[in-house]
Amino acid sequence: MLNGRAVDTSRRPLRKIKLSLMGPAFIAAIAYIDPGNFATNIQAGATFGYTLLWVVVWANVMAMLVQLLSAKLGIATGKNLAEHIRDRFPRPVVWAYWVQAEIIVMATDLAEFIGAAIGFKLLFGVTLLQGAVLTGIATFLILMLQNRGQKPLELVIGGLLLFVAAAYIVELIFSQPDIAALGRGMLIPNLPDGNAVFLAAGVLGATIMPHVIYLHSALTQTGGEESKTERYASTKFDVAIAMTIAGFVNLAMMATAAAAFHFNGYENIAEIEEAYITLQPLLGNAAATVFGLSLIAAGLSSTVVGTLAGQVVMQGFVRFYIPMWVRRIVTMLPSFIVILAGMDATQILVMSQVLLSFGIALALVPLLVFTGNKELMGELVDTKTTQILGKLVVLIVVGLNAYLLISLL
């Protein structure tokens, strides 16, 4: 599907093979720190302080499992999740799957694209429309790297992930959170009221992203001369590092919002622009600037990942291909329509996260069916424990997202 890479392993130790294969999980991990996460984590931290940090911890653990299963499917079978669904499900079901997956990808891209545009607006004082134009140009330039193969794209997106992580280390230094209270928030589950449950569902819904479940299996489905066991060992290392970084960023987002807003009496911060403006007098212009830069980096990289995921679902489900630049133009249109119509940008981010909740179970259930199939997976088939944990994740995700949807209706 996407470009693989050949690596001569005859004279190389496993440690070096692991390092050469690192990358796909860094592309997937970007989806876990997109602008939707910014909005949700800021609101949760401002409203409840450190209380909901434990939700981020467990959501990230669940996301690690999901991404590892997705990557393993590609390694074991040489096919991605969309292709397996196409080959094993009735044709009408496949077409329905494709349509919902495309809607999910476009909803995701809408949030990510508008998030980056907001970042440009805040940082450079341009209009939201001008920010959208800058976002479009920047994403085209990043996507051009795909012509050089998968590795350059992995390096750039991985670099942006590390930049966002570094930015939030700076934000934590500026905000000076209470370390003891932060630790308690991470370790002690607590949902003080119905609004906390609502925000917890939002955090989980913004964390596990259906489009990268499809994408990750495509990023790992081709390889060089390494054995499947070697590739899977490398992938576990890749997923652990990338998702730990993404988890740290989400924790830092919420902790910064708690320290800067909640404990300074600003408990009703619900919009990204409001958070930026409020940061300036509280922590200084430097902190606000770092926040804006991290929002741009997260938005640009995640919208690129969304475009790649769109290619995977179209080619995988219906064997149809369109040039990347055409897809980028088509998926930008809803963002420009929203901006030109004067809709509330942050509200659109929240609505897009709700729409995503419809696609999570639709991706997770067949993924578990396939990775638990001995005939299909061979020696990489899931253990009984893995299958139980996977089904538990499905139940939690579906339950909390159902609560989120019912609460919003």
Swiss-Prot record:
It comes from the Bacteria. Pfam families: Nramp. Its main location: membrane. Keywords: Cell inner membrane, Cell membrane, Ion transport, Membrane, Symport, Transmembrane, Transmembrane helix, Transport. It is found in: Cell inner membrane. InterPro entries: NRAMP_fam. This is Divalent metal cation transporter MntH. It comes from Yersinia pestis. The lineage of its organism: Bacteria, Pseudomonadati, Pseudomonadota, Gammaproteobacteria, Enterobacterales.
